[in-house]
Amino acid sequence: MTVTPLSPSVDTRVLASPVSGPVAGSPSTSRVDQALDTIRDRLDEGFFNDVSQSDLRDINAALNGLTAEERNAVVSELSDDELNKWTDELDNSGFLGMGGGLNVDERRDLYTTLGGSLDATQLERIYNAYDNREQKIELAQGVAAHATSDVKTGFIAALAPQTTEADGMGGVMISDMGDAEGLAVAHVLGSLGGNASALSTAYASLNDTQLSAVFEAGTQQTMYANMQGGAPTYSYDAGPLAAAVDAAATSPDAELKARVFELAGRQMANVSSANGVLTPSVGTGDAADEIRAGMEGLLKSDVNGVVEALEQDYQAGKGMTAFLQETLGQDGGADTIRGLVDQLARGNDLKGDMLQRFTAPTQQDGGVFYPAAERMGYFSGALHQAFEGVNKGAAENVETLKTIFGFATGKLPGPGVGDATGWLSDQVFDTALSQYQSGQADLFESIVALTTPTGADGRRPYDGPAEVSYNEGWESVTRIPLN
């Protein structure tokens, strides 16, 4: 997009502050009518069949002189054709490049005013009046920064049906691949951190297909065509998606967080795998790292709650597998996974006893299951799939497994032990790793032994009714039967 630079001869009157104007109250009919007259007069094209910068600044000034309620009333009185005319002119270079759109700072001031004043219905009307993708996103950023939570959630709900239309835009050389509405929604979702009610309302308005499209757009994939022919290149900037994940991490709702974690993980996997011979891509590593870091923070906010919700709602574990595979490739990634395993074993507060938690039954649907065992099975299955994806070989895998599980050979539960920190006997730990490294056991057998508490005899993993729940969690991800 090309924005017309300001000429030194052009009127550069400073816009009134968006917070100036009459005190809020009932809209004044006379001020609304006067502003409408000004706007319609300034949009009336003159001799050069164009609207000048001065005209557009007069419109801004007219809006700045109103209360929020009056601005909303003014916009509601403008027809769709009038809104289309106004938005077309905001970035119009005019006759011979002498007319005029507003510069980026002036547009930002306008979107600050509109975002903080209009209701969701009028904001959607202005948004849909734009043909220009960049200005759509600028307006959405104004909504994200300045609208009330009710307006933000209404705006998201209004755009939700449009997020799957795949209307990526661009020119011959550079094309934005994601849906504009999806990116707009991603920006607004990222502004809802700390507002549990707004997060719940916003995510409830998006089905999984729509949210996936929003998160895909939030990676800001851009295609660059090659004038000499051959394969195009791609770039990514996942800031909007990462911000949405960070905001979701502040919700107390484990199911909401699990949904965000799962769908963000799928997009991270797509970004991480995008750089290939046929699809050369720039910034995939940084973008994947940014998404992964957000997912880590979200997961750490309630490891047990999120994993339980994932096991119930996303049994294939695609998001968790992608997260763990990306984490294994990070410096210190094994340490991160170790901390997550410890919380799953001993509770989010690290004060529990792994064996007691693992074997604690819960009644459900007339039967009994073991939630801690099922969570550990699900996580362990995803960890196995992540190791398979990284594909480093037995020797290197053993060293990583030592880093992740070595701490679990601490104090084991038993009579008189009130501060047990471990769940693996040295014998079980050493046997699991040595048999895998020597080829006597498969990787999955080693991981199962390391994520199951040592039995009462101290020589072999636990064998009891909780195994059924562990196996269900494991097999839902790996499809590898343990019986």
Name every feature range the model reports, one short phrase each:
Residues 1-11:
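N-terminal acidic, proline/glycine-rich, low-complexity intrinsically disordered segments
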